Amino acid sequence: FGLGFFEYFQLAEDIGAKPLPILNCGMACQFNSAELVPMDQLDPYIQDALDLVEFANGDTNTVWGKKRAAMGHAAPFNLTMIGIGNENCGPQYVERLQAFTKAIRSKYPGIQIIASSGTDPVGERFDFLNQSLRAMQVDFVDEHYYRKPDWFLSNASRYDAYTRNGSKVFAGEYAAHSDSKQTAEKRNNWQAALSEAAFLTGLERNADVVQMASYAPLFAHVEGWQWNPDLIWVNNQQVIGSASYQVQKLYALNKGTHAVAISRNGAVMAG
């Protein structure tokens, strides 16, 4: 689509953000295919990850640092984290993740590893991965949730009981999905946005556990979308922020510094 790692790193630099590339771990999207790369053929994929770190951070006398400099950016991009796999799951994923993690930590111990917890925030697959990834001491467990507004309202206290030690949480993809029978332009509504806002109170209250979060997807064209709802809609003349965008803006521009307890009938309220 005309956006490679170089352009992505430049974009992050321009807007003052930290880049977080997510790399293929040798497994196809498990929604669509069971294809995977055999373990004895995984080395090229691992080398791609190592080369990417060198491209982002390496001195100009390294192979990939020299290529970056030749492209016009001699200074390093200061990459600090990398994701291995997206919504992958099962023992096959853990096996491949272990190989990536060993190689990356051996050569670049300062790079943080973000690992997938699959497609769902509950169930046997999630429980298996959550336990396995924490045993591996990955830096972040990437949790995704596309759920109805009621789920977000009832899960504002989800992270209250999470352990404060070990792997942190990256809420890497989330959005409240209202009635699927609604047209695309009506799925970004205040019901969804308010439930996300309530859920975010729990993330902010547990910021020592959930250290990163990102709504998804970010952009969609009103006449050429594949997924809805989306945070920002565009046409050839306008950019329209959804109700969910207003929630993201509210939290981005008004960072909380204190958690104030609210109780009803002697019980602490959340969400």
Q: Language model features by range: what are they?
A:
Residues 1-111, 115-129, 135-136, 152-153:
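N-terminal catalytic cores of secreted or lumenal carbohydrate-active enzymes
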Residues 67, 156, 228, 262-263:
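Residue-level detector of alpha-helical recognition elements and their boundaries
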Residues 69, 75, 101, 188-189, ...:
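Intrinsically disordered, low-complexity segments enriched in polar/charged residues with Gly/Pro
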Residues 74-81, 188-192, 240, 271:
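Secondary-structure capping and boundary motifs in well-ordered enzyme cores
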Residues 102-105, 109-112, 130-255:
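Catalytic-core region of carbohydrate-active enzymes that cleave or remodel glycosidic bonds
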Residues 118, 146, 263:
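Histidine- and/or cysteine-centered catalytic micro-motif in compact active-site loops
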Residues 257-271:
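Surface beta-strand/loop "capping" patches
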